[in-house]
Amino acid sequence: MVGGLVKGYWIALYKKIRDMDNLKNYAAKVTPVIKSYGGKPLVRGGKFIKLEGDDFKRLVVWEFPTYEKAVECHNSKEYKDGWSLAKDTTERNLQIVEGT
């Protein structure tokens, strides 16, 4: 918690990726947008083991200075324009979660 504010986290579980190039183009476009809202990547892919639950292909976690900034970033025109590059070839679950 920073100055009494609750951090926000994007947690994305990618279930299907039908075009990796589209996903890479999306990431290249939105990374500067996310960082402009104070987003900091904590996890972007990497080795994992599934212990319970449904299968997924990739996990991404971004930390934001506040929950509100995380929501504001997701709802921004710049982010939505970037997501349009991958949304038709990618299935994911994306949550915004309050944290400490």
Segments from the language model and where they lie:
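C-terminal structural segments of small proteins and small subunits
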Residues: V71-E91, Q95
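Short S/T/G/P-rich N-terminal loop/turn motif that feeds into the first structured element of a domain
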Residues: M1-L59, P65-V71, N75, E98-T100
